[in-house]
Amino acid sequence: EELDKIVRATTSPDGAVAADLNLCVRIRVSSDHSKLSLASKFGADAHEMKALLFAARQAADALGICFHVGSQAMTPAAYGEAMERVRAAIVEAAVTVDIVDVGGGFPSVYPGMEPPPLQAYFEVIHRSFESLPISYSAELWCEPGRALSAEYASVVVRVEKRRGDQLYINDGAYGALFDAAHLGWRFPVRLLRDRPSDTRDMPFSFYGPTCDDLDHMAGPFLLPADVGAGDYIEIGMLGAYGCAMRTAFNGFGAVAKVVAEDEPMATLYGGPEREVARSNIVTL
């Protein structure tokens, strides 16, 4: 049905069918290895792929297969298993595939979520790609959103009130902390003071500024025990979706943006860089 829509929309008024379509067919794969599933809304099941790939091949100048293993994939095996589904689909449909798009899911590092080095993911993907029954000139695509962007942004919040181990802050579930509230994710935090605190750390939860009881971030977030009203806290690793999902609910949402060039609060890019090249890449 969706393929028919694309063909109709790209057919010229005189009835000429488009000859330059690049089409990627999404296959549904497991999200079992990821912290956030993206398997329910999109993707064709394995038994649907043969007919769909064959029909798409007739309409496409370049045909691809894509998938998404889910957000924050915690093991490289997620991509190896998905590529096996791609292999089976290609063999069953007996079509030429020009593009394999492994989608996103590349992780970042958060408290309680420490994935293997990204290099391990790349090695599994390259090894699987090289063994697929595809043309020598086929392209390998990926969409490394979180892995690239998570480290780039922090939010500095002010503590408005403290009640025991609960801190009331001026950002929350309807701001940059959606994932902390609705998914229960933890993010690195640090107290911003001219002089470091000499008290021990203890776990806190956060409440945001809105009228909604759901504006709650359970954490736990480890901060010095003497943190209180008027203090400022940096919450890091919010570059992936935090700022993009901010709203103005209840009249909140005004922020000041500052460009800083300090190191991120956590990173997966601390090791030496390695260049991985396919055997059919020639350096001139």
Question: Where do the language-model regions lie?
Answer:
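Solvent-exposed alpha-helices and their adjacent loops that cap or buttress functional pockets
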Residues: 15-18, 34, 57-59, 101, ...
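Active-site-proximal beta-alpha core segment in soluble small-molecule metabolic enzymes
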Residues: 1-101, 106, 113, 124, ...
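Conserved N-terminal phosphate-binding loop of PLP-dependent enzymes in the Aspartate aminotransferase
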Residues: 117
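Short helix-capping and hinge/turn segments at secondary-structure transitions, especially at repeat
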Residues: 88-91, 130, 134, 164, ...
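Generic domain-boundary/flexible-linker signal
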Residues: 34-36, 76, 111, 151, ...
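Flexible, glycine/charged-enriched surface loops at secondary-structure junctions
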Residues: 96-99, 137-141
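Glycine-rich nucleotide phosphate-binding loop and flanking beta-alpha elements
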Residues: 2-4, 31, 73, 108, ...
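Charged (often Lys/Glu-rich) extended helix/loop segments that serve as interaction or gating elements
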Residues: 124, 139-284
